[in-house]
C-alpha cells in the first residue's frame, strides 16, 4: 500500500500549491478493483457528483468505462478510526479494499482556496484496465493508455 502514500502527497501538494479547479488522479492502486470490475472497467470515486458524471460521460464517449463506486462514510470512518494514527493507509480487513483506498486518498484532498469545501476530486483505479491481455477496438495487447482519451475529451470536449 505504499503507492497510495505517494499519491496522497501528490493530492495534498496539488491542492495546496497549484489552486486547481479540480483534481483527477489515476493509479493502478488495488487488486480489489480488479476483483470487483475485472478488466472491462476502471473504478471511479469522487467527492463531487458533477465531476463524477462528467468523467463517466467522457469515458462512455471514448469507449473507456469508468464505473462509479461508493465512498460511504463508513469507509472514511474506517480509515480515520485508529488508536495510533490520524489516518490509516489500509482498511481493517480485506473487504472493500478499493473503497477504503479511495477513502484514504480523499483524506488528502484539501479545501479550495477561500472555501470550506474540498476541491472537487476524482480517483480512477486502473489496476484492471491499464494492461490489456487481448486486442479490442481501442488497443492491441499490452499497455492501454486507459483514460487518456477520457481526460482529453473531458478537458477539450473533443
What are these model-predicted stretches?
Residues 1-158:
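A generic structural signal for tightly packed, nonpolar segments enriched in small/aliphatic residues
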Amino acid at each position: 500500500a505504499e503507492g497510495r502514500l505517494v499519491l496522497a502527497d501528490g493530492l495534498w501538494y496539488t491542492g495546496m500549491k497549484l489552486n486547481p479547479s479540480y483534481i483527477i488522479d489515476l493509479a493502478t492502486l488495488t487488486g480489489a478493483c480488479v476483483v470487483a470490475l475485472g478488466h472491462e472497467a476502471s473504478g471511479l470515486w469522487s467527492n463531487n457528483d458533477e465531476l463524477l458524471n462528467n468523467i463517466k460521460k467522457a469515458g462512455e464517449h471514448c469507449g473507456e468505462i469508468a464505473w462509479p463506486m461508493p465512498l460511504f462514510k463508513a469507509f472514511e470512518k474506517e480509515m480515520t478510526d485508529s488508536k495510533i494514527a490520524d489516518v490509516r493507509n489500509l482498511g481493517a480487513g480485506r473487504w472493500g479494499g478499493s473503497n477504503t483506498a479511495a477513502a484514504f486518498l480523499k483524506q488528502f484532498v484539501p479545501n479550495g482556496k477561500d472555501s470550506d469545501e474540498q476541491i472537487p476530486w476524482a480517483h480512477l483505479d486502473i489496476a484492471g484496465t491499464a494492461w490489456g491481455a487481448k486486442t479490442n477496438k481501442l488497443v492491441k495487447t499490452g499497455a492501454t493508455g486507459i483514460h487518456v482519451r477520457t481526460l482529453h475529451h473531458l478537458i477539450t470536449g473533443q
